[in-house]
A protein has these predicted regions:
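Short, catalytically relevant binding-site loops at active-site mouths
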Residues: 32-34, 48-49
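Residue-level structural signal for beta-strand termini and adjacent loop
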Residues: 2-4, 31, 54
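Nudix hydrolase/Nudix homology domain
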Residues: 1-2, 34, 39, 77-147
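The catalytic Nudix box helix
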Residues: 43-76
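Short, His- and charge-rich active-site/binding loops that engage polyanionic ligands
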Residues: 9, 30-32, 38
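A structural signal for short, well-ordered beta-strand segments
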Residues: 16, 44, 97-99
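Hydrophobic "anchor" residues
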Residues: 24-27
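Acidic, metal-coordinating catalytic segment for phosphate/diphosphate chemistry
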Residues: 1-15, 21
């Protein structure tokens, strides 16, 4: 996102938490070339495109970043949170989704420009990454990991 927004203007982003029936979650590691939070763990997500509904954006982002098609997975929209950065031109709403499905690792096709690895993590492993300050948005999305 390179566009600066005025105070009171927001853009829409989405996050897609993808879990397996065994209670583990797919998390990816950000490439070290990222300007912000390189090497941190995260879930798939990104900005909605012009004219795109939130639900369309999360399906697209998960597919682009992981290769997974979550259209027929259990779950869906969970909650929205707002982030404001006054004077920085970076205000946004985040729609958080959770999908649960069987995942065969051969179905994963990571977007190499964005990710440098993945793991299926337990909630405790995710909490440990967060405690180290290495899990993006954890405090805002932690309830999405409660199944």
């Amino acid at each position: 996102n390179d566009e600066c927004l005025k105070d009171g203007e927001y853009h829409l982003t989405v996050l897609g938490v993808v879990g397996r029936p065994d209670g583990t979650f797919l998390i990816t590691k950000r490439v070290m070339t990222k300007a912000w939070a390189p090497g941190w763990w995260e879930v798939s997500g990104g900005a909605a495109q012009a004219g795109e509904e939130s639900c369309e954006a999360v399906l697209r982002e998960v597919k682009e970043e992981t290769g997974l098609d979550v259209r027929n997975a259990e779950g869906g929209y969970l909650f929205t949170y707002k982030r404001e950065n006054p004077g920085e031109g970076d205000n946004y709403f985040v729609d958080v989704y959770r999908f649960v499905m069987d995942i065969d690792e051969s179905d994963l096709h990571l977007q190499t420009e964005e990710t440098d690895g993945y793991m299926f993590a337990t909630v405790d492993e995710i909490k440990a990454f967060a405690a180290e300050g290495k899990f993006l948005h954890y405090d805002s999305i932690k309830k999405a990991f409660e199944m």
